[in-house]
UniProtKB/Swiss-Prot annotation:
One Pfam short name: tRNA_Me_trans_C
Protein name per the record: tRNA-specific 2-thiouridylase MnmA
Segments for region (Interaction with tRNA): 138-140, 293-294
Organismal lineage: Bacteria, Pseudomonadati, Campylobacterota, Epsilonproteobacteria, Campylobacterales
Places the protein is found: Cytoplasm
EC number: 2.8.1.13
Gene: mnmA
Site keyed Interaction with tRNA: positions: H117, Q325
Length: 342
C-alpha cells in the first residue's frame, strides 16, 4: 500500500515511517510548514530528510503557513480576546494534517496518511472510528474528535499500540542516527507557543491591561493584570483584599476586562453545552464518558443532541470547565465526536 507519512523531524514520526517501511508499504514523506521560524523549519526539514534517506523514500515539503495562520493561529488569538481558552490542535488536525495534507497525499496516489499520533483506528460494522491509544498517559484521541468517518478510514497511527517510554529505545536501535540529531526542546504542547501563551498573545494584542476582580455577588474585591492572562480554575496572579483562603477564577468578562472569582466548590459544573458539533452518524442520546479538558479524567454523563447543540448532564460535579475547550464524547475507549464548549 502507498502511504504518506507526516514527518516532523522528530523521533516519533521517524519511527512511525520505519515501522511502516518494515511492513512493506511504499512510503512518501511529507513535512508540513505550519508555524515556526525559517531557522527551525530548516533544521526540522534536514532531520526529516535524514530519516527519508535512511529509509530510501522521497520527501515533500508543503507550505501551509498562510492557511494555518488564518484557520488556526488567528482563531487562537481571537478566542483569548473573547475570554475563552482555545484548543488549536483540535482545529489543526481536521483542517491541516487530515485536511490539506491528506488531500495532497491522495493526489500523489497514496491510499492513506500516517502520523506519530498516539491513537488508534478501529473498524466497527465497516465504519472507522478513532480509538484511544494503548498508552493512556499519552493518548491524543481528544484532539481528533472533529474527524469524519471517511477521513478516519484513511488514517494510520503506527504508535497507537505502543508505550511512549518504549519508542525512543526502539527507534534508536532501528535508526541509530536519530540519537545525533540536533533539535529544539518544545516546552509547550501547542506547537507555535515557544515560552508561554501569554508571550504569544503579546505579539498581537494588549495583554497587560489592569482590571477589577469581583466575587459572585458582583462586589469588587481586588485587581488583576489583564483578563487574557487567566483561565478558568487559575488561583494565582491576581490580588484580593484581605483574602484568608484561596480564590479561583470562575468566570471571565472580556468586554469589561473583569475576573469573577470564588471558592473551589464554585468551579463545579453539573451541566454544559457545546457548539460546532461533530458526532458519529449513529450517535444516540445516552450515557457516555466525557472529557472537557485534555488532561481530565473521563467523567460519566448523559449526553443529548438538541438542535445541533451537544448538551451534557454530569453524574458527578465536574470542575474547571472553560469556554473554548473541546468537549469530547467516548463510549468506552471509542471516540464518538465532540464540540466546542460555550
Amino acid at each position: 500500500m502507498k502511504i504518506a507519512v507526516l514527518l516532523s523531524g522528530g523521533v516519533d514520526s521517524s519511527y512511525s515511517a520505519y515501522s511502516l517501511k518494515e511492513q512493506g508499504h511504499e512510503l512518501v514523506g511529507i513535512y508540513l510548514k505550519l508555524h515556526a521560524s525559517e531557522k527551525k523549519h530548516d533544521l526540522y526539514i534536514k532531520n526529516a530528510q535524514k530519516a527519508c534517506e535512511f529509509l530510501g523514500i522521497p520527501l515533500e515539503v508543503l507550505d501551509f503557513q498562510k492557511d494555518f495562520k488564518s484557520a488556526v493561529y488567528d482563531e487562537f488569538i481571537s478566542a483569548y480576546e473573547e475570554g475563552q481558552t482555545p484548543n488549536p490542535c483540535a482545529l489543526c488536525n481536521p483542517l491541516m494534517k487530515f485536511g490539506l495534507a491528506l488531500d495532497h497525499a491522495l493526489k500523489l496516489g497514496c491510499e492513506k496518511i500516517a502520523t506519530g499520533h498516539y491513537a488508534r483506528v478501529k473498524e466497527i460494522d465497516k465504519v472507522s472510528y478513532i480509538q484511544e491509544a494503548v498508552d493512556k498517559t499519552k493518548d491524543q484521541s481528544y484532539f481528533l474528535y472533529a474527524l469524519e468517518h471517511e477521513v478516519i478510514a484513511k488514517l494510520v497511527f503506527p504508535l497507537g499500540d505502543l508505550l511512549k517510554k518504549d519508542i525512543k529505545p526502539l527507534a534508536l536501535n532501528a535508526m541509530p542516527f536519530l540519537g545525533t540529531l540536533e533539535t529544539y526542546k518544545e516546552s509547550q504542547e501547542i506547537c507555535f507557543v515557544e515560552k508561554s501563551y501569554i508571550d504569544t498573545l503579546k505579539k498581537h494584542v494588549e495583554v497587560e491591561k489592569e482590571g477589577v476582580v469581583k466575587n459572585l455577588q458582583g462586589e469588587v474585591i481586588g485587581t488583576h493584570k489583564g483578563y487574557m492572562q487567566y483561565t478558568i480554575g487559575k488561583r494565582k496572579g491576581f490580588n484580593i483584599k484581605g483574602a484568608l483562603e484561596p480564590h479561583f477564577v470562575v468566570g471571565i468578562d472580556a468586554k469589561k476586562n473583569e475576573l469573577i472569582v470564588g471558592k473551589k466548590e464554585d468551579l463545579a459544573t453539573h451541566s454544559l453545552k457545546a457548539k460546532n458539533k461533530s458526532l458519529t452518524k449513529d450517535f444516540k442520546d445516552g450515557e457516555y464518558f466525557i472529557k472537557a479538558r485534555y488532561r481530565s479524567v473521563p467523567a460519566k454523563a448523559f449526553v443529548s443532541l438538541r438542535d445541533e447543540v451537544i448538551e451534557v448532564e454530569f453524574e458527578e460535579p465536574f470542575y474547571g470547565v472553560a469556554k473554548g475547550q473541546a468537549l469530547v464524547v467516548y463510549k468506552d475507549d471509542i471516540l464518538l465526536g465532540g464540540g466546542v464548549i460555550v
